[in-house]
A protein has these predicted regions:
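Generic N-terminal amphipathic, Lys/Arg-enriched alpha-helix
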Residues: 1-12
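Residue-level detector of functional hotspots within protein domains
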Residues: 3-4, 22, 64
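A short, N-terminal amphipathic alpha-helix
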Residues: 21-29, 69
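Active-site-proximal beta-alpha core segment in soluble small-molecule metabolic enzymes
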Residues: 34-104
Length: 104
């Protein structure tokens, strides 16, 4: 099969480039003594999460589904944030989050 025969849309992921960037980020975090928290808005390619998980970064999530995705594929260090929460959603938010932020 050639690249022109692949079903579209598709993404080409260069694992070596992802790892190079994650190595750089991890190095900066270590030298600055800070914690890295990945935003799903910046990387929603969940098929890469097995690579990201190796680096131990936390993640941010703004929905129940993002929280579940983070818990299942990334880390226990999950920061929930939203301008508003519903009382009905709070049990699941607390179940999947390690931190809850109330922002505007």
């Amino acid at each position: 099969m050639t690249i022109n025969q692949l079903p579209t849309p598709f993404y080409i992921i260069y694992e070596d480039r992802i790892r190079r960037n994650l190595d750089l980020i991890a190095d900066v975090a270590a030298r600055a003594d800070v914690e890295i928290i990945m935003a799903f808005k910046a990387n929603a390619l969940w098929r890469t999460f097995n690579i990201v998980r190796e680096y131990g970064f936390g993640c941010t999530a703004s929905s129940i589904n993002e929280l579940r995705l983070g818990r299942e594929y990334l880390t226990d260090n999950i920061h929930a944030y939203s301008p508003a929460y519903t009382e009905a959603d709070f049990p699941e938010i607390l179940r999947y989050s390690s931190h809850v932020t109330f922002n505007s």
